[in-house]
């Protein structure tokens, strides 16, 4: 049985990032600020605020891109660590213009952690990008998807 009293387990609140699937990440700045204050009151320290998508044809709200310039306007409480999710396939897609999607060095960003949603088949191909982002000063999380049918050896 899993011992949930372990000190190294950290909660990552994904409410805004996950909720964005219902409204294209189009939350008002007022709503986001209120939400962040409530998260702080609840003593939650890690929040995945949104995605950092490549430019899309479809219009997305501010948390679909989670640009540094937008995050700075939110006055995020200092105790809260900000995470954004990226789709690994976006980095592996040769048709994307990566210049539109480069992360700043960590000390110029309010983002602390970048979580890569990665299919099992892509894990080896995404490693150079994980290293690149880590060199910029960010913490990196890999969300390994579609691995339930893999063997223990894989």
What do the predicted segments below correspond to?
Residues 2, 27, 55:
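N-terminal glycine-rich phosphate/pyrophosphate-binding loops that anchor nucleotide-derived ligands
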Residues 2-24, 78-79, 109, 139-143:
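N-terminal small/glycine-rich loop or linker at the start of catalytic domains
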Residues 6-14, 36-53:
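N-terminal glycine-rich anion-binding loops that anchor highly charged ligand groups
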Residues 14-37, 42:
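N-terminal phosphate-binding or glycine-rich loops at protein starts, especially the Walker A/P-loop
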Residues 40, 46, 51-154:
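Active-site beta->alpha loop and helix N-cap motifs at the rims of alpha/beta catalytic domains
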């Amino acid at each position: 049985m899993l011992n949930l009293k372990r000190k190294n387990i950290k909660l990552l609140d994904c409410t805004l990032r996950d909720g964005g699937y219902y409204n294209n990440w189009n939350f008002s700045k007022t709503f986001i600020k209120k939400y962040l204050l409530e998260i702080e009151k609840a003593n939650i320290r890690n929040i995945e605020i949104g995605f950092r998508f490549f430019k899309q044809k479809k219009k997305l709200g501010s948390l679909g891109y989670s640009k540094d310039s937008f995050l700075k306007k939110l006055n995020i409480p200092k105790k809260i660590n900000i995470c954004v999710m990226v789709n690994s396939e976006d980095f592996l897609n040769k048709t994307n213009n990566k210049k539109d999607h480069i992360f700043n060095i960590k000390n110029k960003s309010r983002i602390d952690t970048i979580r890569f949603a990665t299919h099992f088949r892509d894990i080896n191909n995404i490693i150079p990008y994980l290293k690149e982002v880590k060199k910029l000063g960010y913490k990196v999380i890999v969300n390994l998807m579609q691995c339930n049918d893999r063997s223990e050896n894989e």
